[in-house]
Amino acid sequence: MFRDSFLFARTIGCFGCFGSSGSRNQQSPKPYDDDTHSCDSDVTSTARGEEEEDEEEVEQKSRSKRSEEILKYRLDNGLICRHIPVRETNELIRGEDENGDKTINEYVRVCKIGSGSYGKVVLYRSTLDGQYYAIKAFHKSHLLRLRVAPSETAMSDVLREVMIMKILEHPNIVNLIEVIDDPETDHFYMVLEYVDGKWVYDGSGPPGALGEKTARKYLRDIVTGLMYLHAHDVIHGDIKPDNLLVTSSGTVKIGDFSVSQVFKDDDDQLRRSPGTPVFTAPECCLVSGITYSGRAADTWAVGVTLYCMILGQYPFLADTLQDTYDKIVNNPLIIPDGLNPLLRDLIEGLLCKDPSQRMTLKNVSEHPWVIGEDGHVPEYFCWCKRNAASKIEEGEANGISETSDPN
């Protein structure tokens, strides 16, 4: 049932229009195929007038510009949470090795592992460290021609994704290793860590979804990674199993930041959700112009993902996109009888239609079902916290107190 609804979801635009190929070659290595982009599916799009379109264009431009300005400031001032900065390479050498395999600088092509409307994802092996990497390959001219919003091209999405990934480093987030952008060529590459396991979706079809044990393990990783993003003022915007990759050791990593936004001063208000329709929060399905909390919308998407992992189907899905949105907004949540009461409570809390009453990720991390036998979800002591702590310790060692008066 789940796989049937999954395939249907692709046909109505829930996955296919986001740059994914819509199919997977099961014989190929499992890719980190996050070369996706979402089309804005507004349930009132047919009723919008020119004035509303202009207002949305201004808002879209303002939101994206705000994110880019914040990111540029953080990068320019070294406000990043990475122990090792992303390498930036401005020279591209394309060729072949002695076996006739194509090469990009130090990387030797192995096979194509994904494709999308923006470009393709190819598995490469580094001749320097012998490791495998997933490289997203783009043509800059194509990105500049491809319009994704009234005032934005696909190049804006890709550059914003790069900037976001440059400031982040976490074990539950796909890591950006290098960016190759030679101004003398039309090629642009993102070198990412290769996740050699599977998608969260794999194995989630009949006859029994994932089961509580696996779903709990995956959820803990998802919550840990997303809490880190929110703590660093990043809204993912498209949390769904397709963007959650599982390593061979079972660790979940969040990928695809192509529609993500950043905020500051605790102001996470957004308009026009860019995410996948069946994972869209009710407040994002309402008449355009209404703002919503990006963090609360991300949390709803976590709830839909958990529902999928546990029950093997979507909580709200209809025959058309319009009807799907109507169900998300108006239909009651249906949870089968006999489900673990603690799990039922968690799903109901995550999929609360009122965002002000919806569970926060902190609530989720402390929920009895999530704690289970594994204990509380550990707080990740990230690089910027470690760096700040070391500076405080260094200051104390030098006799400088945070509260000391320099005068």
UniProtKB/Swiss-Prot annotation:
The modification Phosphothreonine is found at T153. Activated when autophosphorylated at Thr-153 and inactivated when phosphorylated at Ser-260 by SnRK1.1/KIN10. It comes from the Eukaryota. Residues 31-40 have a biased composition (Basic and acidic residues). Residues 21-64 are annotated as: Disordered. Keywords: ATP-binding, Host-virus interaction, Kinase, Nucleotide-binding, Phosphoprotein, Serine/threonine-protein kinase, Transferase. ATP binds at I113, G114, S115, G116, S117, Y118, G119, K120, V121, K136. The keyword Kinase applies. Gene3D superfamilies: Transferase(Phosphotransferase) domain 1 (1.10.510.10). Expressed in shoot apical meristem, leaf primordium and emerging petiole (at protein level). It catalyses: L-seryl-[protein] + ATP = O-phospho-L-seryl-[protein] + ADP + H(+); L-threonyl-[protein] + ATP = O-phospho-L-threonyl-[protein] + ADP + H(+). Its EC number is 2.7.11.1. The active site is at D238 (proton acceptor). Functionally able to complement the yeast elm1 sak1 tos3 triple mutant. Activates SnRK1.1/KIN10 and SnRK1.2/KIN11 by phosphorylation of their activation-loop 'Thr-198' and 'Thr-176', respectively. Required for the regulation by SnRK1 kinases of the transcription of a large set of genes, the modification the activity of metabolic enzymes, and the control of various nutrient-responsive cellular developmental processes. Belongs to the protein kinase superfamily. Ser/Thr protein kinase family. Associates with the SNF1-related protein kinase (SnRK) complex. Interacts with AL1, a geminivirus (TGMV) protein essential for viral replication. This is Serine/threonine-protein kinase GRIK2. It comes from Arabidopsis thaliana. The lineage of its organism: Eukaryota, Viridiplantae, Streptophyta, Embryophyta, Tracheophyta.
